[in-house]
Amino acid sequence: VEENMKDFKKKDFIGKEEVVTLTIVLISIILLFINIDSNIINVIMYSLVMIPLAILLGRGTSKISDYIGEKRGGLISATAGNVPELMMGLWSIKYGMISMAKAGLLGAVITNMLLGLGIAVFCGGIKYREQKFNKIIARTNLNMLFLVMFTIIIISALNRYSIVDNGSFQKISLIIGVVLICVYILGLIFSLYTHSNLFILDEKKMLPKNGDKNDTRKVFGLIIIVTILLYFISERLVGGVNAIVEEYKISQEFLGIILIPLLGSFGENASSIVCALENKIDASLETAIGSSIQITMFVIPILVICSSFMGFQVNLLFSTFQIVTMSIAMGMSYFVFQDGKTYWFEGALLIAVYLVVTLSYYYVV
């Protein structure tokens, strides 16, 4: 009888985790219908509500990797985590804040590669002393990022050493954007299908884990609900930021490179940290680096293409300092992850580089 009562309680009553989840979701929905006269309070309010939603997203995607593998789980985590960046980028373009949209996406890459990954490696290293990962995953992902970096450098050189008008630059950016999207799709085919065996650290991870299908559906449902809420909240957030920029004459680029990435990238960074603490270092790397790949090879090209239909011109031309900071982020990540092992000190190095970059950016803009 006691065992039956325990089973009954497990099945019919909501646990503490479900209560917290429902509370966060309900608060988020209520805030969508609240509008305060102060733009600063609105921005703070929507920024704060994005954090618990991002944590929920991170926990959900971490659970998914148990059922579909760390590579696919990391891919889903990165995809879901990049939805806010895409939405905030589109809304920024709609409000005419082109420089903030571009700086926000570049800042998201820097935040993922240095801060998010640094905290994940640091926390994972403190708990497990040493964590091993698949070098092929890291090398392939970083090679794709270097392709984007070379593309941006070539476009910058073209702008510096040739006479090209804005219309031609837009056309060039559109063509290159399509090429990057195609390469990204080919990379997914390579890593998930044709050579998926190369991206598995442990043979046991090839076998699917037994789990309740209802639990899996609940997790997917949670991810969908949280993603939708993040879409609407990001709209309100960008609208508030636009009002603050116009009222206080704050630099769009500074907000884009610092504030927007911290909020938009919170989901994948939280997921990366959770995975590292659970010793799923492959999923952690796939989330952080895979998110940067999606931003540079999918989100940015999509924004370039969409901007043409929105009446704005968004190209792939970045400033010299932006290119330097992005190169430093990729270079540091490459040197840290080339040996197939991570330690807490390497995470501390990545965090230190992020602090140096952000402090430098304060004086540049």
Question: What is the predicted role of each segment?
Answer:
Residues 2-59, 114-239, 318, 324-365:
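Alpha-helical transmembrane bundles of multi-pass secondary active transporters
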Residues 62-66, 70, 243-246:
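Short amphipathic alpha-helical coupling elements at transmembrane boundaries
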Residues 64, 110, 184, 245, ...:
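Residue-level signature of catalytic and energy-coupling elements of molecular machines
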Residues 68-78, 99-106, 130-142, 170-174, ...:
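The feature identifies polytopic integral membrane transport proteins across all domains of life
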Residues 209-281:
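Transmembrane helical segments that form the transport core of multi-pass membrane transport proteins
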